[in-house]
Amino acid sequence: MALLDFFLSRKKTTANIAKERLQIIVAERRRGDSEPHYLPQLKRDLLAVICKYVQIDPEMVSVQLEQKGDDISVLELNVTLPENEEAPK
């Protein structure tokens, strides 16, 4: 049957190809826009609180928000603490 499908299949028009590409672009942008607008400020606030107690590099803090289903969001905070404990200035 695969051989029959090969000969009877229609070639995609450029309009269909453009439509598929546009759908992919829209889906990727929707996925990227799901991040709340307050997330960068939240990261700065968390970093300020952590810096009150431990001196760390801001690059060592990672904040990510994951969607688990329609109504569940998971906020993941990863902090790499220095090996030697220095008091904050």
From Swiss-Prot:
Keywords: Cell cycle, Cell division
Family assignment from sequence similarity: Belongs to the MinE family.
SUPFAM superfamilies: Cell division protein MinE topological specificity domain (SSF55229)
Paired cysteines (S-S): none
The protein's name in its UniProt record: Cell division topological specificity factor
UniProt source species: Edwardsiella ictaluri (strain 93-146)
One of the GO biological process terms: cell division
Recorded coiled-coil stretches: none
UniProt cross-references to Pfam families, sorted A to Z: MinE
Described function: Prevents the cell division inhibition by proteins MinC and MinD at internal division sites while permitting inhibition at polar sites. This ensures cell division at the proper site by restricting the formation of a division septum at the midpoint of the long axis of the cell.
